[in-house]
From Swiss-Prot:
InterPro entries per UniProt: NADH_UbQ/plastoQ_OxRdtase_su3, NDAH_ubi_oxred_su3_sf
Single GO MF annotation: NADH dehydrogenase (ubiquinone) activity
Protein name in the entry: NADH-ubiquinone oxidoreductase chain 3
Subunit annotation: Core subunit of respiratory chain NADH dehydrogenase (Complex I) which is composed of 45 different subunits. Interacts with TMEM186. Interacts with TMEM242.
Organism: Halichoerus grypus
Its membrane topology: Multi-pass membrane protein
Catalyzed reactions: a ubiquinone + NADH + 5 H(+)(in) = a ubiquinol + NAD(+) + 4 H(+)(out)
UniProt subcellular location: Mitochondrion inner membrane
Organismal lineage: Eukaryota, Metazoa, Chordata, Craniata, Vertebrata
Catalytic class of the enzyme: translocase
Length: 115
């Protein structure tokens, strides 16, 4: 019962915060809010510089692989558990998923920087 109450409370609080975050910015929209700010001076150029979409995709891919590798960090402590077979199976599954996703990115040329 405590677990269900905790999950419900966390879900309700997260949903409430997301709704507030989407609702509040729509209350006051005016031109000064969307203009670039340069310490009170008139802007010398456009502050909306374009960036490479390839850079963005490589950065997102790096973050995903970094998160997956962070999941492997507790493995040395998990090796002291009673059920070593389950731990090794899950670790092998995670490493296989990491290797398969790296192979997929490589074959789809997602890691190539030149366009």
């Amino acid at each position: 019962m405590n677990m269900a109450l905790t999950l419900f409370t966390n879900t309700a609080l997260a949903s409430l915060l997301v709704l507030i975050a989407f609702w509040l910015p729509q209350l006051n929209t005016y031109s000064e809010k969307v203009s670039p700010y340069e310490c009170g001076f008139d802007p010398m150029g456009s502050a909306r510089l374009p960036f490479s979409m390839k850079f963005f995709l490589v950065a997102i891919t790096f973050l995903l692989f970094d998160l997956e590798i962070a999941l492997l960090l507790p493995l040395p402590w998990a090796s002291h558990t009673d059920n070593l077979t389950t731990m090794l199976t899950m670790a092998l599954l995670l490493i296989s998923l990491l290797a398969a996703s790296l192979a997929y990115e490589w074959t789809e040329k997602g890691l190539e920087w030149t366009e």
